[in-house]
Amino acid sequence: MIEQKTSNTQKKINKTVRLVALEIWILVFYKNKKFDDIIKKSFDFNKLDKRDKSFLFLLINTCMRRHNQAQKIYNKYSRFGIKKKNRYLNGILVISTIQLIWLNIAPYAVLNEAVNQAKIYIGEKQSKLVNAILRKIVTNKNDCLNFIPEDKCNLPEWLLKSWTSSYGEKNVNEIARLAMEPPPLDIVVSNKMKESELNQFKLNLSGKKILPNVIRCNLKESVESLPGFSDGLWWIQDAASQIPCNLLLSKIKQHFSQSIDSIKVVDMCCAPGGKTAQLLNNELD
């Protein structure tokens, strides 16, 4: 619950998923907090159901990738522009613009929630400004889609200059375009998991098997929420990063006649531990 102060009393308001998203966005963008750290400790986030958590993940991650583009769009419909220091005004407009332009959420749901948030955090007068700007975005959506600046505008200025100098403007445009796409996640399944369990796990993730024990998926929730996480039945590791261990295992089998479980391997600089898990999964110490 949050408190909305009025002239005579304090009214308690239930936090919707978009309100939780706004508060998380303020912490991420203005206070440089890590998204993963926030949601682990957030009572409001953990109170959401699975569907709302997935939506919040998608929304915040899209905001992190495209907030500069969103700001340029809504500032087009603001007479004087919205200053960065106006945290909640910017936050409400970024989150709403992302929903309208990139996530294609129904305008009524977005505008109604945005106006309510504005009334809570920045007052009645500013809520009218929010409503006016977002209505213009809805009315002129096709113009907004044509107006969207290149993806590279989302890159920090120092990084854009460095990459342009090193790779050239054309290549930087392509790098930035790819950087805006949600990255797939590779999940490596332990030998403990039966084939039937692996196939069911793949279906639950809406993923595809790219190697005998690797499922690639587009996860929209916390990995800790997936079954088998606490039991060590799987771990996160890019498919390409498995190659060194696979080569090592091949050489061990080729050159050592003794049982593989008598071989000891020193894994130097092993954080975050994907290769270590891979070695342990193959019964190496």
Report each predicted region and the residues it spans.
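Non-catalytic accessory regions of SAM-dependent methyltransferases
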Residues: M1-V138, I148-P149
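Glycine-rich nucleotide cofactor-binding entry segment
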Residues: T139-N282
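Short beta-strand element of Class I
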Residues: D285
